């Protein structure tokens, strides 16, 4: 059944998801706050800054007016930076006339509160103005989705029927969705993998080989699982698409902003230079701070996250940081046991 979807955020991922929805026959309106970008989408059907080669379906409309984007919508898809989630959700709540499903595909933790994105949205959009909230996450580069490369991700909601709705909304012959009811696990994996990707990029920038890259990914996954379980997640989620799947794709590809930023840090560039060079939001930088603070609060050991925090915020030398983490006291590998 044809649905009307408002896509909030015309970045690379928002644009790619809008394309999927339009190609599936849905009515799509993209909202953004840059008039020149919105005009480009409407008149040229391109978004050159983010996806230079993509020609968008002509059925996609775009607007800078949020109220217009939200008229008669069946679903609202948030794809804005984590730092903008609360303010955009507040605005959305003012304009909603229908009770749409809320979907978000952003990855991070809110600064200061350390809250997951679905928690922030739930606080700002009252239950009487919406249906459930669904998290869309997994191993997915926008650049590959835009050219129809096969991609599989997860739709997670406490209400599985809402996750199934999103599954049916997006699925086609190149974009497959699996459902999950572990919202905490899916959101935690989505946010924290960006931290580990910064480290993986730094490892590459320092000139280390595959052994080191494998080490940071596997021990990074242990940290993600450790914090996630402390927050109430199912540990099995972290060996799925939104856990190890997203970690692999983010830690091994030049498409990953966080990997590229880490690579520059490993080559000796300062954080300010790196962010200026990137020209796009690098979610892992702010997420590192939030995760470090949350780990302290929950008394969860996260040595890789702590090391990356010190590099980013205490100006610790990357080479020295790599040595220090290797010289920590010995540990056991297995932390969780599963009863079958």
Swiss-Prot record:
For this protein, the Enzyme Commission number is: 1.1.1.94
Q: Known PROSITE patterns for this protein? A: NAD_G3PDH
Keyword tags: Cytoplasm, Lipid biosynthesis, Lipid metabolism, NAD, NADP, Nucleotide-binding, Oxidoreductase, Phospholipid biosynthesis, Phospholipid metabolism
Q: What class of enzyme is it?
A: oxidoreductase
Detail the disulphide connectivity of this chain as listed in its UniProt entry: none
InterPro entries reported for this sequence: 6-PGluconate_DH-like_C_sf (IPR008927), 6PGD_dom2 (IPR013328), G3P_DH_NAD-dep (IPR006168), G3P_DH_NAD-dep_C (IPR006109), G3P_DH_NAD-dep_N (IPR011128), NAD(P)-bd_dom_sf (IPR036291)
Q: Pull one GO CC term from this UniProt entry.
A: cytosol
Query: Its domain of life?
Result: Bacteria
Q: Which GO terms describe its molecular function?
A: glycerol-3-phosphate dehydrogenase [NAD(P)+] activity; NAD binding
SUPFAM superfamilies of this UniProt entry? Answer: 6-phosphogluconate dehydrogenase C-terminal domain-like, NAD(P)-binding Rossmann-fold domains
Which Pfam families has this protein been placed in?
NAD_Gly3P_dh_C (PF07479), NAD_Gly3P_dh_N (PF01210)
UniProt keyword Nucleotide-binding, yes or no = yes
Where is this gene product found?
Cytoplasm
Alphabetical list of NCBIfam families matching this protein: PRK00094.1-2, PRK00094.1-3, PRK00094.1-4
Q: Which family does it belong to?
A: Belongs to the NAD-dependent glycerol-3-phosphate dehydrogenase family.
User: What does the UniProt record say this protein does?
Assistant: Catalyzes the reduction of the glycolytic intermediate dihydroxyacetone phosphate (DHAP) to sn-glycerol 3-phosphate (G3P), the key precursor for phospholipid synthesis.
Query: Which protein, by its recorded name, is this?
Result: Glycerol-3-phosphate dehydrogenase [NAD(P)+]
What is the name of the gene encoding this protein? gpsA
